[in-house]
């Protein structure tokens, strides 16, 4: 479909000397270096992706400010999903200050790294999420399968919150686990209005990933979320631990090949425009 916006709804930039990326260690050699707009621009040009959503990779307000500065000087970055201390007494003030920047489109606590799986259900977090909703921001849920039942409980209390589940909730593809994830994903789709990102799956599938290994997971997401609630993202540069940018994009397009053009266009860009108000 000519003229349709193609959006990568999940990519990162970082600069190691900032010092706030605790998860990014030398053993992750392919991505243990700085990544910026100059690294991604040729990949976007090669693949015909016109714009991106830049997502936080450190649980600090300072990193979010850094990303907003990058967005201000990078034409292809249409929005930023940042971080704020949603359980802090001053959360509303922090969110209000960050939201003054027009590029801020959402916030993402790094739920997968928080030791207490019930953290998201704490009353101060609920108040923080009401602030997110009040400022018209999306909430990115970086969760694993074990978080999905709590996430369903959380969203029942926040029916108006625009929620995007990152990386298909990280199914354990390499281990061949499907059943519990599939049941909880179905419940999430049926009980909430959440969107889910078609991203990060090659990382979860391991070094011997293939389109066919991903297919049952993608088909399950499509069956229950449908093309109106599925959003493409690259998870670049993390994806390069398993596949190149163009390689993952081609795999995603292969997995979506059975859909009509309008449905593919929604997944490959229009849904991101809607949920992040790009």
What are these regions (language model features)?
Residues 2-7, 31-51, 220, 225-231, ...:
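Mid-to-C-terminal alpha-helical segments outside catalytic/metal-binding sites
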Residues 1-135, 141, 188, 212:
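Mid-domain alpha/beta scaffold segments of enzyme catalytic cores
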Residues 62-77, 159-165, 217-223, 248-255:
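Short, electropositive alpha-helical surface patch
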Residues 59-60, 86-89, 114-118, 171-174, ...:
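Short, small-residue-enriched loops and turns at beta-alpha junctions
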Residues 41, 65-69, 96, 152-153, ...:
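Active-site phosphate/pyrophosphate- and oxyanion-stabilizing loops and adjacent acidic/basic residues
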Residues 119-231:
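Catalytic pocket-lining loop regions of alpha/beta-barrel enzymes
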Residues 11, 57, 168, 235-236:
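Active-site metal-binding loops of divalent metal-dependent hydrolases
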């Amino acid at each position: 479909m000519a003229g349709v916006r193609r959006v990568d709804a999940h990519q990162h930039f970082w600069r190691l000397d900032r010092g706030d990326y605790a998860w990014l260690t030398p053993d992750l050699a392919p991505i243990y270096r700085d990544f910026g707009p100059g690294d991604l621009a040729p990949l976007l040009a090669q693949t015909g992706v016109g714009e991106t959503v830049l997502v936080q990779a450190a649980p600090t307000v300072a990193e979010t400010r850094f990303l907003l500065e990058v967005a201000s000087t990078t034409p292809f970055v249409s929005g930023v999903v940042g971080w704020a201390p949603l359980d802090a007494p001053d959360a509303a003030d922090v969110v209000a200050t960050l939201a003054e920047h027009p590029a801020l489109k959402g916030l993402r606590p790094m739920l997968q790294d928080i030791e207490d799986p019930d953290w998201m259900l704490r009353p101060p977090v609920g108040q923080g999420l009401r602030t997110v909703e009040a400022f018209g921001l999306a909430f990115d849920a970086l969760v694993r399968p074990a978080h999905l039942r709590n996430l369903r409980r959380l969203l029942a209390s926040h029916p108006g919150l625009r929620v995007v589940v990152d990386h298909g909730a990280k199914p354990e593809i390499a281990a061949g686990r499907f059943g519990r994830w599939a049941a909880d994903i179905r419940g999430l789709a049926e009980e909430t209005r959440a969107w889910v990102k078609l991203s990060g799956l090659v990382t979860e599938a391991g070094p011997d990933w293939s389109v066919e290994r991903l297919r049952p997971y993608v088909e399950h997401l499509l069956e229950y979320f449908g093309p109106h609630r599925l959003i493409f993202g690259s998870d670049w540069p993390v994806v390069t631990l398993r596949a190149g940018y163009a390689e993952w994009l081609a795999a995603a397009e292969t997995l979506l090949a059975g859909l009509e053009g309008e449905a593919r266009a929604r997944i490959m860009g229009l849904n991101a425009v809607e949920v992040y108000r790009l």
